[in-house]
C-alpha cells in the first residue's frame, strides 16, 4: 500500500485488490466479510466481533454511498448489534449519509499525532481535512 494523492489535495492509502486480499480476505486470525452493492460498484468490508459490526473499509461512488449504506443496514435484518465506522467530519457527504442513516457520533474516536521531519510537509500534516482514513487503517480492527 502506498500513499495516494487525490485531485482535491487529500491523501489516503492506495488500497489495491491485492492489498485488500492480503489485509482482510487472507487474514490469519480475524474473519472479515464483504457486502457488495450494484454489481460490485460499491463494497463494504466489515468484521463482526462481540456484538459489534465494524465497517473497516467502505469503497463507493458518491451516488451509491447512501443507498449502499441503507442496503447494508437492512441486510443485517434481525441481528442485534452496534454498527461502528470511522468517518471524518471533513468528508461531508459520507458523514451526513451516516447521520441520516441513524449513526451517532460516538467512540471509538480516531486520534493521531505527527512529527514533521520535512518542513515541505508541514502544510499537509497540519490539515486534518486532507486525510481520508478508515478503521482498516488501524491494527485495532
Regions found by a protein language model. Give the residues of each.
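Amide-forming acyltransferase catalytic core, primarily the GNAT-like/NAT-type
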Residues: 1-58
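Active-site/acyl-donor-binding loops of N-acyltransferases
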Residues: 43, 47-66, 70-141
